[in-house]
């Protein structure tokens, strides 16, 4: 076969020559326009006048055709210039790629990893593939692939080398955990976010229990400078078949185990929230148990300078019979930076509580270290509605989470979280559940004010209504300077 070689220099030179020819032709046409279009009749007779008019009309037609030819000439010159530029750009790109391949060849051969470049994304499928690692010197990690086969976790995100961001973890298949986020660059880069856990399968037939939701993936840790990746959310539990239990929700990814901020600077990653429990199936003689909600993950800690990540929220239990229909716990906030940074806020607790005593399910605010304010406590979940298993009494509201402590040198304590409301009675003759107690305010150490106490919650409606919960106590002020925090209002 024949080969064609395009030289960008030759194309650009031809375009320049054509432009010069165009200028010469235009000058000649302009010079000929006046004498040809304005030719005078040599005599006053009709024949002379007709000949002059014929020559003038022909000259005008020539000028019109010349204008069209000039426009075509201009377009042709533009196309030649564009073609030459395109060929030149392609040659530069090929040269860069060849240079990049030559640079990456030694490390790719010895270490199985390029020196410069982004990692490839993992393929999605029955088993999600992990993302490729970024270049040793520079490059982002590839994202993990999503899984589709039941119970299989998503692919992990690829890690960066010296500079770059970690890849996102893939989402889990039904009932499978989310993939972990990739690590950020050792020098600079953010950690990748964890993947989302898959939803549990619903029960099949009369005897099928709902499947549990998958746990969320862990957020990726940053290196020296960068923010930690967020943890993935847990999947919801599946619904139970007739008379069978619903699946429990998956837990949120823990930012603490991978979502920490950079050692020098960076915020901790936010934790994922827990999934909701699946609903119980309804049977002829008895109902199944509802699934529990998943716990929220803990926020990631900051390094030297940075803010702690927020805790994830707890999931709610599913609908259906359960003697202890307890809401899942929210995650604690991450700790602030060693030198400077506020603590992260605690996650909210899931709804649901014991008939008479609420479970402590709100996340606590993260504390500061040297300088910084403590994080606010999470809100407590509401009590569960009354049921036959609880004697018709509504569940107690959950207490609010405690605020984090201020920094050792300076910082205010975090505010306590608000309590959850008591659950309503099963019917108009059943008592409502008591309201929860507000969370305690965080303590200041040397300089700073104590955190305000969280608000107490109202009791649930019923006959009689549930007792209101008291507000949380305020935190202690600093030893050298500061005032105590105010107590929270009663419900």
Swiss-Prot record:
Disordered: annotated span: 114-156, 376-400, 419-491
Alphabetized Pfam families for the sequence: PE, PGRS
Disulfide bonds: none
Stretches with biased composition (Gly residues): 128-145, 432-480
Domain PE: residue ranges: 1-92
Top-level taxon in the UniProt lineage: Bacteria
Family: Belongs to the mycobacterial PE family. PGRS subfamily.
The name this protein goes by in its record: Uncharacterized PE-PGRS family protein PE_PGRS36
Gene: PE_PGRS36
């Amino acid at each position: 076969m024949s080969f064609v070689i395009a030289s960008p220099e030759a194309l650009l030179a031809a375009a320049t020559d054509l432009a010069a020819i165009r200028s010469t032709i235009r000058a000649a046409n302009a010079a000929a326009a006046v004498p040809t279009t304005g030719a005078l009749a040599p005599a006053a007779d009709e024949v002379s006048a007709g000949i002059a008019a014929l020559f003038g009309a022909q000259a005008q037609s020539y000028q019109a055709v010349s204008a069209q030819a000039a426009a075509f000439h201009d377009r042709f010159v533009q196309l030649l210039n564009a073609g030459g530029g395109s060929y030149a750009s392609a040659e530069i790109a090929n040269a860069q790629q060849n240079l990049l391949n030559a640079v990456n060849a030694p490390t790719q051969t010895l270490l199985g990893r390029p020196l410069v470049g982004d990692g490839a994304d993992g393929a999605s499928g029955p088993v999600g593939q992990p993302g490729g690692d970024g270049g040793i010197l520079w490059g982002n990690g590839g994202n993990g692939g999503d899984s589709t086969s039941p119970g299989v976790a998503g692919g992990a995100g690829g890690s960066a080398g010296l500079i770059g961001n970690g890849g996102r973890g893939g989402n889990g298949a039904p009932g499978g955990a989310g993939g972990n986020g990739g690590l950020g660059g050792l020098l600079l880069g953010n950690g990748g976010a964890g993947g989302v856990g898959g939803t549990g399968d619903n029960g099949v037939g009369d005897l099928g229990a709902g499947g549990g939701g998958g746990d969320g993936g862990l957020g990726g840790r940053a290196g020296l400078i960068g923010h930690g990746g967020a943890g993935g959310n847990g999947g919801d539990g599946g619904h139970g078949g007739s008379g069978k239990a619903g699946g429990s929700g998956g837990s949120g990814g823990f930012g603490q185990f991978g979502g920490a901020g950079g050692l020098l600077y960076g915020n901790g990653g936010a934790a994922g929230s827990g999934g909701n429990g699946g609903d119980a199936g309804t049977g002829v003689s008895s109902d199944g148990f509802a699934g529990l909600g998943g716990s929220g993950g803990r926020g990631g800690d900051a390094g030297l300078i940075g803010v702690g990540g927020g805790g994830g929220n707890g999931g709610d239990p599913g609908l259906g019979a359960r003697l202890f229909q307890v809401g899942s716990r929210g995650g604690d906030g991450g700790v602030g930076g060693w030198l400077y940074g506020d603590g992260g806020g605690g996650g909210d607790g899931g709804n649901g509580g014991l008939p008479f005593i609420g479970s402590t399910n709100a996340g606590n605010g993260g504390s500061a270290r040297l300088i910084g304010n403590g994080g606010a406590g999470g809100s407590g979940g509401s009590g569960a509605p009354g049921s036959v298993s609880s004697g018709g009494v509504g569940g107690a509201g959950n207490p609010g989470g405690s605020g984090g402590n201020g920094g050792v040198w300076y910082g205010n304590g975090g505010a306590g979280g608000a309590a959850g409301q008591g659950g309503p009675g099963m019917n108009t003759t059943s008592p409502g559940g008591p309201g929860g107690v507000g969370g305690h305010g965080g303590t200041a150490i040397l300089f700073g004010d104590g955190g305000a106490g969280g608000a107490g919650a109202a009791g649930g409606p019923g006959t009689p209504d549930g007792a209101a919960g008291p507000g949380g106590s305020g935190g202690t002020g600093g030893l050298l300077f500061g005032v105590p925090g105010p107590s929270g209002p009663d419900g």
